[in-house]
Design a protein with these regions (language model features):
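Membrane-embedded helix boundary and interhelical linker motif in transport proteins
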Residues: 1-39, 69
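Cytoplasmic-side transmembrane-helix entry/capping segments in multi-pass membrane proteins
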Residues: 1-2, 50-58, 192
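Membrane-water interface segments at the C-terminal ends of transmembrane alpha-helices
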Residues: 7-11, 53-79, 125-128, 162, ...
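Membrane-interface helix caps of multi-pass small-molecule transporters
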Residues: 9, 13, 36-47, 69-70, ...
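Transmembrane alpha-helical segments in multi-pass inner-membrane proteins
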Residues: 28-30, 167-247
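Helix-loop-helix "hairpin" substructures at the membrane interface of multi-pass membrane proteins
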Residues: 34-36, 110-187, 211-212, 216, ...
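Transmembrane helix-bundle core of multi-pass membrane transporters
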Residues: 56-134, 241, 276-282
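Cytosolic-side transmembrane-helix boundaries in multi-pass membrane proteins
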Residues: 146, 153-160, 226-284
Length: 284
């Protein structure tokens, strides 16, 4: 959401800039907005101990409210409209279309709706893979994620790594919103995003949190979502069945971890029971 708002703020201004300057500037502004917004939960975690999951959920609501304010139409009581509101849209809360110089060009036009943002996403995947698995920073990120205490003992600055990681994650989320806005919608409206963020969590889990695995999982979920409406129209099958399929896929992926956890608990219980019996036998 923040990436979309920041990119649109640049895209609807600076008319006359060439695309080679305007488009990268809009993309970078979206990533910067996402990075700042994502770094805040990391900063709160290392300074106050606030749980990052709870804080990020709260930040989601704040981002939605802030974005809604930027395109607020003003209402019927003469309230001041938002700074990005399209004055020609009357009572509709949305921004104007970004200038053509800030739009990501189509790769395949309608009905396919495929644009060059696909390549930006693939480049981001490769960069993340290289950063996480081929650099010292990536090693520190993985170490802090697996065992913060061991990372601190090894001399890694845990606080700095946490803030950096959250900021990078925010930048990637901002890039996703930017690509969606500049490539497809060309404007921002309050209903932007929907469940995309939560779908991203599901896709990451399905892809085993590996950059290349996420690509495969995202294509699977994207194909299911894209075919849902057509399936309902042509075959009469409810589109909600797609959500059921996605939930089942995730359940099957998580099943091995659940089974391992159950067996681990059972083994711990058996060992504790055996220890109790041995102690009782020895004491008698």
């Amino acid at each position: 959401v923040m990436g979309s708002v920041c990119s649109v703020a640049i895209g609807i201004h600076f008319e006359g800039l060439p695309m080679i300057i305007h488009l990268p500037l809009a993309i970078l502004s979206g990533m910067l907005g996402g990075m700042i917004w994502g770094a805040i939960p990391g900063l709160l975690k290392v300074t106050t101990g606030a749980h990052e999951v709870i804080v990020t959920i709260m930040m989601n609501y704040l981002a939605s409210l802030f974005a809604g304010w930027t395109v607020y139409a003003g209402g019927t009581q003469g309230q001041t409209p938002g700074p990005l509101w399209d004055r020609t849209a009357r009572a509709i809360s949305e921004t104007p279309d970004v200038f053509e110089s800030a739009q990501i060009p189509w790769l395949f036009g309608p009905p396919y709706r495929v644009h060059y943002g696909v390549f930006l996403a693939l480049i981001a995947v490769f960069i993340v893979w290289w950063l996480i698995y081929k650099t010292t920073i990536g090693f520190e990120i993985r170490t802090v994620g697996q065992n913060p205490k061991a990372a601190r003992y090894a001399g890694i600055r845990v606080e700095k790594t946490v803030v950096l990681t959250m900021g990078l994650a925010g930048a990637l989320a901002g890039l996703a919103g930017t690509i969606e806005t500049l490539g497809l919608n060309h404007k921002f409206a309050p209903e932007f995003g929907g469940q995309v963020g939560f779908d991203g969590i599901t896709v990451a889990l399905l892809g085993q949190t590996h950059p290349f695995g996420v690509v495969i999982a995202s294509f699977l979920f994207g194909a299911l979502d894209a075919g849902a409406a057509k399936m309902q129209f042509e075959s009469g099958v409810a589109a909600d069945i797609i959500q059921v399929i996605q939930a089942l896929v995730l359940a099957f992926v998580a099943a091995p971890l659940i089974i391992k956890a159950l067996f681990r608990l059972r083994s711990s219980g058996d060992e504790g029971h055996a220890t109790k019996l041995n102690t009782s036998w020895g004491g008698s």
